[in-house]
Amino acid sequence: MSLRFIYGRAGSGKSQYCLNSIKNRIEEDIDRPLILLVPEQFSFQAEKNLIEVLDEKTGFKTQVLSFKRMAYRVFNEVGGITAKHMNESGKSMLLYNIIEDNKNNLKVFKKAAKRQGFITTISDIITEFKRYNITPEIILNNLENIEGDNLKYKMEDLALIFSQFETRLHKNYIDNEDDLTILAEKLNKSKQFDNAEIWIDEFSSFSPQEYSVLEKLLLKSYRINITLCTDYLNQGRFVDTTDVFSPIKNTENKLLQIIEDNNIKLDKPIALKCDPCARFKNSAELQHLEKNMFSFPYKEYKNETKDICMLKTLNQFTEIENTAKDIIKLCIDKGCRFKDIAVITGDLEGYENIISSVFLQYNIPFFIDKKREINNNPIIVLILSALEVLSKNWTYESVFRYLKTGLLDINNEEMDILENYVLANGIKGYQWTNDKLWEYKSFSNYELEDQVEKELLAKINDIRYKAMEPIVTLNKNFKSIDKAKEFCEVLYEFLCNINLPDKIQNMIEDFKVEGEIEKASEYNQIWNIVMEVLDQIVEVIGEEKISLKEFFKILQTGLSEYEIGLIPPTLDQVMVGSITRLRSHNINTLYIVGVNDGIFPSPLKEEGILSDDDRKFLGDKGLEIAKDTKSIAFEEQFLVYSTLTTPSKYLRLSYPIADGEGKTLRPSIIISRIKKIFTNICEENDIVKLNGEEEELKNISSAKPTFNYLISNLRKDVEGAKIDNIWGDTYKWYLENEFWIEKLNRLIKGFDYTNQSKYIETKKIRNLYGKPLKISVSRVEKFSQCPFAYFVQYGLKAKDRKIFNLSYPDLGIFMHSILEKFSHELEKQGLEWDTMDLNWAEEEIDKLINEELDNKSLDILNSSKRYEYVTKSVKKILKRSIWLIGEHIKRGNFKPSYYELSFDIDGDYPPIAMELHSGEVVNLIGRVDRVDLLQKDGATYLKIIDYKSGAKEFKLSDVYYGLQLQLLIYLDAILTELAERSGINGEPGALLYLKLDDPIVKNTVDMSDEEIEKSIIKNLKMKGLILNDPNVIRDMDNIISGISDIIPVMVKKDGGVSEGRSSVATKEEFETLRKYVRYTIIEICEEMLEGNIEIKPYKKKDGSSCDYCIYSSVCKFDTNIRGNKYNILIDKKDEEVWDDIKKKLEC
């Protein structure tokens, strides 16, 4: 019985020493068992290495074991396992059931139990307890030593859950985590390790369970040899936590304590001192890095490096692209094999998709060493969403998640038809399952669409029944059962009824034919996992009574614990993985990507259920559990050391300066540390683009990515830029290659591509727009924003998918409608705005809204609590608005005379006729919200008011650009009609926008009601253009003094208007605007009828017409495409606008 340490720094040859020692023992023909004990993840590599050292005849004399394998060997020899193992999925389902049963008895975790991930957290802490040999009884016996209620109650909850878990588990099962505890007990009876010599390699630490096993092995074996990656042995002394080798030295101390307690001999250690070490014999740079990375003081390496390189990149994509180029270069220039290369990162999740995409493009064979979650696999999605449909009562999300799995007998066209119908009509819940046929209706401006053809409606209902029938049957079968076992049986029957097993088998065969072996393996495993989870539910809680919702949660919990492990399909491929899963030292070349702060080294992990303080307190009381986060952070140093010393020939560290969203990333402290050691390190970057053939050569690698670079350079050449001669030779190579020539020619033709189609035939436009042209003024403004957007919306009549909701425009129309009805009711009752009773007015608003909802069958406003809130908000806004209108009218002499004044064939006034230069007449239609009149000095002054549910400014420059024409053309039309029809001398008074809102007034505690009302009036001040006449202005605001709080005007002390602080125009200027608006509309309409459909959105300093355009996917506007340019509109000062308008009218 003895223990011997084999120690040395990384790369010193410890593993090789073990293999050679085993070989020597075999050659010496010593008759004793020879065992190599390694971590589970290293067992495959260790077996390979052992076979390489030993010949086929002697290889069988040595066993390569992990602790788990050792346990199975002993159990097979002496017995001990009479029950089946429960996997992580079964444990999670059992824990969920225990927590649900005991949630009212939990003191700390009652609320936390509902949180996602809580079951996994509890499972992890129980695993931790078991690995540290802590039982529920030990926790209970130590409760009296715990001070502080929070920790005490926490441990009581954990003891309760842990105790019931153990009791229920051991009825039929055994936990995987119990294997080593049982192994330690059974080793006394085992004979296979008697007098054995054991080599233990690749461990940096052990759990208490493993120490118990080692103690028993030490008492039975001839000798145990343990490798320690350290510079020197600690020999039981105090360990400095800042020492990079502190985890190893802690392990050494614990092993020394075991042999001291058992009076076991300590053999002379084997010290593997080397310079250089075997691993770094071909690289002085890597040897220097190993020696100095964590040495203080360190020694500088002043020569230029070639084996250690750094790369600074613009983002993660260019980082991986540069990595791929470097891998290709190494393989071509230096004969490196893909299997000798590894790419690792501290953020595999963030890099996985980028690496997959880039490496596939560069034809680099690779395998991502990680277990895949199964939650997003279509089979799992189908099962869980089918149950979610029932547990959540047929919500849109759950139904279409189920239907879109691709595993049902519904094709994509049927899916789209059904989904469009459901979205347009807000179908959910009982509407899916009632016997009534669906009637086609949709919500838009309170009007039902025309009846859809009977064939389409019948088709929709057929698809509906085909979609819902299996789940309706499933629900029917669920209603007659209440046991977990029965739920599993019914679900399995459902899966068979939809032919899921056969469909999965067909998919697996298809994947194999297409060469997608990983996919085939994944789908094969998934079905087996589903069956395994159902079996475990039956065996663990099969006879317990549960509800459908509980069954859904239990199944979801069980499936969420599964991950799929895939086997590398070939040997010669680049290994891609996480820093923590780096498995082999047989790596020549290592790329560490994402060497950024917070990624490598990894940041401190969250403390979990037990905080650092909790762990320290429990440790002080004799309850040793896993290390706190600070201790783990110190141990991270050793992980960094192990990672950096893994490659034997070449190491490259790269870091981007920004992530995928453009957020700044800082380089890791590792970068600065290495730069200090290697003062002349090879450092590259792709941020500053260098010119020259040597730089261009870096972009020539595999055919596909090189082709992309070629096309980019050919485009530059076409556009007149100078490119390197090397691309001419590259172009010739692709021209001579049959596979590429067609693609090359096709893409070169694409250089002439433009998405522009500036004009189409007048005849076609006439067919689309109609003749004679009859359009609203708002459409004219739309054309000014972008001719193409107008064409798509009003020519092609393209519509966005209809959704059952109340859009902002719908809300505005609804409020306009209520205000119009209220205004007419006011007239009908013979009441005036300025004298009406406010209580009556508010009751009338309530009544009108309720009537409107009933009459129009607007189910949406009663469809949810949210829309009920919207209805209440609309009532408040409208009540505030009628109060505000009344206050405005009280302040002036203008009287409301017209409401919703319309210009149309059947309107209050005829359409506004605009004669084009060709003699053709265009009819403009529209509606004015309100017109107030003032009779004064033989003239009738008009105040035109437009109600707006959002903010709206009046800008003279927008009038100039044709973006704000409505109020001016309505003014012109009304003045013209008054003069021609009635002989009335009409004059412009004001054009105003009134915002419909109920603003919140802040800091009202010390304000009187009058002050609050004044604040609201000021907040809702109207915007627009006012006649520059002090007398008329006072007729709009008779208490004006200084700045008006209802209109955009400021008067001076002498009574005159402050033009610089007011939005005003003289009578002559209004007349000029009337002429200009007519001129502009004629120009726009002529352009429209000439077939102008140019993609030309406007752009101003505060935004562009593209910002909220729904047709961007149609036009694909991009300033990088030839001919795609914004129509830049400069915000001009009013003086400039007046000058430009006059110049245009003079032409």
Swiss-Prot record:
GO-annotated molecular function: 4 iron, 4 sulfur cluster binding; 5'-3' exonuclease activity; ATP binding; double-stranded DNA binding; helicase activity; metal ion binding
Record bears the keyword Translocase: no
Binding-site list for [4Fe-4S] cluster: C786, C1106, C1109, C1115
Listed cofactors: Mg(2+); [4Fe-4S] cluster
InterPro entries on file: ADDB_N (IPR049035), DNA_helicase_suAddB (IPR014140), DNA_helicase_UvrD-like_C (IPR014017), P-loop_NTPase (IPR027417), PDDEXK-like_dom_sf (IPR011604), PDDEXK_AddAB-type (IPR038726)
Keyword 4Fe-4S included in the entry's annotation: yes
Protein keywords: 4Fe-4S, ATP-binding, DNA damage, DNA repair, DNA-binding, Exonuclease, Helicase, Hydrolase, Iron, Iron-sulfur, Metal-binding, Nuclease, Nucleotide-binding
EC numbers, comma separated: 3.1.-.-
Cofactor note: Binds 1 [4Fe-4S] cluster.
Domain of life: Bacteria
GO biological process per UniProt: double-strand break repair via homologous recombination
Leading EC class: hydrolase
Residues bound to ATP: G8, R9, A10, G11, S12, G13, K14, S15
Family label: Belongs to the helicase family. AddB/RexB type 1 subfamily.
HAMAP family found in the cross-reference section: AddB_type1 (MF_01452)
Note: Despite having conserved helicase domains, this subunit does not have helicase activity.
Subunit structure as annotated in this protein's UniProt entry: Heterodimer of AddA and AddB.
Free-text function comment from the UniProt entry: The heterodimer acts as both an ATP-dependent DNA helicase and an ATP-dependent, dual-direction single-stranded exonuclease. Recognizes the chi site generating a DNA molecule suitable for the initiation of homologous recombination. The AddB subunit has 5' -> 3' nuclease activity but not helicase activity.
Protein name: ATP-dependent helicase/deoxyribonuclease subunit B
Organism: Clostridium botulinum (strain ATCC 19397 / Type A)
